[in-house]
Amino acid sequence: MRPGQFAVTQATAINTDRTAIEAMRPSWLRLLFWVVLFQLAWYFRPLQDLLLHGAMADPDDFLRLHEVRNWLAGQGWYDVSVPRMNPPEGGDLHWSRLIDLPIALLTVLLSPLAGAEMAARVAAAIWPTTVLCLTLATLIAICERAWPKTNPFVVILFALTNIAALAQFAPGRIDHHNVQILLVFVMLLGMMSGRHWLGHAGAGFCMVLSLAIGLDNLPFIALLLGWLALAWVFDLEDAREGLLRTAAGIVLGLAVLYPLSVPLGQWMAVRCDALSIVYVSAMALAAAGFAALGFVNARNKAMRFALAGLVGAGALAVTALAFPECRAGPYSALSAELTGRWLSQIHEARGIVDFASRFGAANYALLVYIVLLLAAGIVLVRRRIASSHLLPVLAVLAICLVLSFLQVRALRLGVFAAVPVCVILADLAWRHFSAAPGRARAAAMFMTGLSALFLISPVWLVVANAVLPPPGNPADTAVAGDAPEWSRQENVSSICNRDTDFSFLATLPPGLVLNDLNTGPAILVFTGHSVVAGNYHRNGRAILETMDFFAADEATARKIATRRKPLYVAYCQPLPVAQPSVPSKKGSSAESIGRRILDGREPAWLQRISPAADRLNVYRMASDG
């Protein structure tokens, strides 16, 4: 068959399939109903705990809610500090009000009906589900561009089995991570919509929006810009127009979002960990370079590659020379001590090799899963089974693979990005099995379902953990009879996160609490107290002093308490299977204050005042302490 005949035949087949799909397509309302129903069923207990007890999964969610409350109470748009953290200076934060905005709007709208407190909880349930629905709608649109025969229900099936990523959309997950996932797929959809001027322009705008919200996606955006340049080098369809439109979107994003994110007086201030003149300069240089490449009429690929490399290297070099303090990345300002003792202990900030060496080789399963799907996608495009629209999807998969060696959390994004390839393979399997003469439809469905099991990521994790069980520590196993009463309750979190955990502390006169790091934000939400610290890197001295207090010996801990002058000390007991050993350069673990608190051997200058059955141990500082 000649290429022209193949193209006509393929176009005819696509149009026929598209007509058939449109005829049986479920309505968006029906899809929305099933997604919301899934959320209610899968997260029934977390939703119940959120509405009845204000429970959320992560300290960042509590601090986000506290930020929203502060803003609604009159704190300025540009002022995202936390006055009740690390007093008297206040907690310095790099967060964005852009995430606070929809949560605050929902809270205000619901307050007349439910009251302020319940309105905030309902808003915390609605917002993640809304972001999930938008993410799934974007994924469906991506799959339809890559494979016109897409069944939306199949997209939802593969997406909702990505348990690791789905946890970011659970009720109460109101911090920015789920929005960042959504923005990645909006960028991808824009790149796949090259024939529409809004596609690449929207992708460029979303790059800046993502950076304005947080720098989580910074490495991804850098590699995505590199992919766009490579598409121009190899003269892919609409690549030139894509560069120009992406540049326009970036410029528009900078013009709109930078003034919304940074007050005029700080436009020239250098901040390595948030949108600042550093990243504005880098993105503006990239946009200028893209615009220049778009007008270059070089036909030689080697020349194109050299020019694209010059643009990329030039933007990086100029930024590095102009802002040397940020050459080490967003966390350049952190001290070596804070990086070694605190940042390095954040598991998701580690690469896959380090993560797997600590938690077991079974964690390589998702890496292998994505590699195989990437290879399958390349074969589909090379054999023209799938169109070139799949190429941006494969680029995102490759980017996630590269980033996983820096941060393991890139894999959960990669599993989401692999959904279009899974949809295509599942559809091809159905067509193969249903085309066999004499085979019943039920048998074809069974064979397709069996094949689809290998495309579902949790199956890989289950098998990998069965073959390569994670390293265990016999000391980690708690005897049921020895476990405290609070730990026997259903759905107990790894952190203190219910209002009942803080009910006693809330009755005490307001004062400064020297707290374990994970508990600080919840104390701000559930009580009127101030806290010394939370896991927020700009407050490095407070973080280290808190770690030293609980991990050091009595003499060192007392010096810290004397310097900080707290009225209370609060320590959330960890789950019996997760007794901590906080890294510290001072003192020994066995005689640390944290260990002694857990063993009931606290020093005399700490007077236990909370009920013995409470999970949150609350102590009053003795008058001479």
Model regions: which residues?
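Signature aromatic-anchored transmembrane alpha helix within multi-pass, membrane-resident enzymes
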Residues: 308-313, 430-470
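Active-site lumenal/periplasmic loops and adjacent helix-entry segments of GT-C-fold
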Residues: 44-145, 151-158, 162-183, 210
